[in-house]
Amino acid sequence: MGQSSSISSSNEEGSSHSKKFTNSKDILAYFNNKAQQQVTIPELVSFKGNLQIEDLNTPISHKALCNSLYFPQNHAMIVGIVTNMLRVLSNFPLMKSSYEPITGYGLLKCILLLNRARCAKFLKTKSYDQLKLLFISLSLQKTDKEELSEESENDGNKELTIKQIITGFDDVDTEMLCIPADFMLQFLTWLLILTVDCPTTNSKLDNTETHDQWGNFKVSALNLLRTMNPDVVGDIESHSITFQQFSTAIRTVMPNLLKPLENLMEHFFYLQHDLVDHDTNLSSIQDSKVMTPALLAQLSTGLPKELFIHKLQSLYIGRKSGFSMRSLQAKVFKWMAPSILVVSGMRITNSEEYAAEKNPRYRHFLEEFPKLKESDQMMDASHLNKRKTTFAVYIDDPWKVTNKDYFGDLNTRIIEISPRQDIYKVNQKGTIYFNTIGGGIGIGDKQPLIKPASKRYIPGNVSLTFDSTLEFAVFRNTGYGGSLDPGLLSMERKEENSPYELHFLIQDVEVWGCGGEKELEEQIKQLEWEEAESKRRQQINLRSLGEDRALLEMAGLVGQHQGGGSM
């Protein structure tokens, strides 16, 4: 349909993979031209229009970059982190050895490299380690040019193929790199805000309100930071994040973390009048103490991406309706679609002292719950030093009273939210009970043994247990053998057999409806229609000799023997 940027691009592509390069200039030129070939003519027109440039070799001003990325006011650190990241990526594939400023070509490469699908197409490989590239871009500092060693200068004469250049990461050794924890905290906070502000590639951005909540999002970002490095519990400035920590956490328990960054970068391909208003559904959670925009953003990093576009429905809020099984049952049991149970409280650090001196009800609970011995527990620093504890349970089935049996399908999962993030998936159906004869609520437990004069909880190896008064809860993790597997993060780190137990005093319990399949399908169709409409409005009739033709010539896309991007 559209004009090709190269008459014989397919032939050149085949021969270029065997082509060898000996100097940086040719390498950069090759990847710059290839980047332009990856985008459509309408995308290129919008890209140039947003940046107000005609030539892709034009350096992008700091002001234009900041305006396009909608950085928060008075947050110089995140501006520095992201602009440095983009400068590193703009010099791809010579991230370490090239110090060119960010040009139109460079920014095009940034957009492609930060988009998972576009990156695979751009580099012609699905196995490329995009997380390693991102980590390098966040680690390297492009302030002062390093003095090249004699060995590096001699390497300039080496012949390298495209594959060698791509997979070599410019000889950057990620084992020698790390990101300061305070830098990573700022970056994670910004990504969580983008989750709310930029849910799609074509949504209008008006982030003043969410930027005012930077502190709230920072709390959730701290949970993600401790997921990467559980030792970050005190002085953040004294800690750092390694590539192994960064990669492991994102791959296992926050696979959607970078999607909002993809969405933001795609905005360069839409002019302002092509953007659409998007309802982020935050009005329904404005009265919640727990289900805040920040917590919802954190949840969306690990749960299926469809969750965030669900119309969340407040079903039960303990602070309003009362902390009782009866109130929860009355509010929740008519809901016939998926739901999320959220519980938050303060960890009881000295059980015996608390039971003896402060809360006789807890002493009674300990008589019914078989507590792990302190000497048998192996908690990491985040669990030992942080008392705030929050869990969510995703439940696909409708709730029901189960005094003898269980409910819950294979999509049920427990998500640890604070002090770090981990995800515990079920390995069988029927893992939840709602016991109205004194047994409370259990996920991953066996039904309690209830007799006229006694009661005994039977916690599973991985389980979350609520007492019948919704005053106390216990999360147990002792490894394999139960109806839930150990956490994805724990298994990846080979820590699944490190037993621990979190007893906490419940402060909040809430249940939120996620919407049924029909509503979800309608919302997805609406989003797809909106994006298609934006693309349709974006299309320019290349045969027109009117204003559209003039715009293309001004942008240097047609006329004067110019080609363009692909269609």
Curated annotation (Swiss-Prot):
Claim: Chloroplast is one of the keywords in the record: no
Signal sequence bounds: none
An example Gene Ontology CC term for this record: cytoplasm
Native source species: Saccharomyces cerevisiae (strain ATCC 204508 / S288c)
Described function: May be involved in a process influencing telomere capping.
Ranges for domain TLDc: 289-515
Keyword Cytoplasm: yes
Family note: Belongs to the RTC5 family.
Keywords: Cytoplasm
Anything else known: Present with 2600 molecules/cell in log phase SD medium.
Protein name according to UniProt: Restriction of telomere capping protein 5
UniProt-annotated location(s): Cytoplasm
One BP term from GO: protein-containing complex disassembly
Pfam families: TLD (PF07534)
Coiled-coil ranges from the UniProt annotation: none
Alphabetical list of PANTHER family matching this protein: NUCLEOLAR PROTEIN 7/ESTROGEN RECEPTOR COACTIVATOR-RELATED (PTHR23354), RESTRICTION OF TELOMERE CAPPING PROTEIN 5 (PTHR23354:SF130)
